[in-house]
C-alpha cells in the first residue's frame, strides 16, 4: 500500500464503516480492506516481569542459528516443532531434535537465575532470529510465564505461547554406552 501511494505532500484519507470496511485513498490510489471487530482478536496476556534472563542479542541469535536446523518441520510430534529452553543457575541450554538429529547448545549467562524449563515454538525462534540485530553490545530480555514467553529488545516486544508438555529426556538419549563418541 505504501509503495502505491504517490508523492511526499499527498493527502491520505482513511474511512471506515460500521462493518469494519476501510477505504484508504491517496490521489489516484484506492485500497479497500475488510477489517474485524477488535473484540474478536485474542487477548494479549500480561506477563509478569519477575521471571526473566538477560543475554546479548548476538549470543541469542547464534544459539538459535546453531540449533534451529534440527527442529521438525511437520506437526506429527508437537514437541519436535519447538526447542527446549532450559536455564539452570548461570547456564542457558537450547535443545532441538527432529527424530534424526539432535542439537544442544549451552552458553554461560552473566548472572545466576532461577531454574526455568520451557518449550518454545520453532517458528517463534526463527522470527526472533530474523529481527535480532546480532549486536554484542545490545541485550535481549526473555520473560517467562506459565504459558507464554516474551522477548524484549530495542523497541520490540515479541510474545508467544509456549508448547505445553514434557520435552524428551535428553540425558537418557545421551547415555555413555556408545562405541564411538565425538565431542566438538
Question: What does each model-found stretch correspond to?
Answer:
Residues 1-184:
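Structural preference for solvent-exposed beta-strand-turn elements
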Amino acid at each position: 500500500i505504501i509503495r502505491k501511494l504517490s508523492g511526499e505532500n499527498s493527502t491520505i484519507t482513511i474511512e471506515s464503516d460500521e462493518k469494519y470496511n476501510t477505504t484508504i485513498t491517496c490521489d489516484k490510489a484506492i485500497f479497500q480492506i475488510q477489517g474485524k471487530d477488535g473484540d474478536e482478536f485474542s487477548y494479549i496476556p500480561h506477563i509478569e516481569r519477575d521471571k526473566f534472563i538477560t543475554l546479548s542479542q548476538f549470543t541469542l541469535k547464534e544459539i538459535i542459528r546453531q540449533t534451529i536446523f534440527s527442529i521438525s518441520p511437520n506437526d506429527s510430534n508437537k514437541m519436535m516443532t519447538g526447542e527446549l529452553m532450559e536455564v539452570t543457575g548461570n547456564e542457558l541450554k537450547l535443545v532441538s531434535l527432529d527424530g534424526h538429529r539432535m542439537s544442544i547448545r549451552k552458553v554461560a549467562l552473566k548472572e545466576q537465575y532461577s531454574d526455568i524449563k520451557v518449550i518454545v515454538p520453532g517458528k517463534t525462534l526463527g522470527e526472533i532470529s530474523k529481527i535480532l540485530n546480532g549486536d554484542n553490545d545490545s541485550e535481549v530480555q526473555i520473560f517467562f510465564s506459565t504459558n507464554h514467553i516474551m522477548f524484549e529488545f530495542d523497541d520490540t516486544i515479541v510474545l508467544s505461547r509456549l508448547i505445553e508438555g514434557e520435552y524428551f529426556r535428553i540425558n537418557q538419549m545421551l547415555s555413555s554406552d556408545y562405541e564411538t563418541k565425538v565431542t566438538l
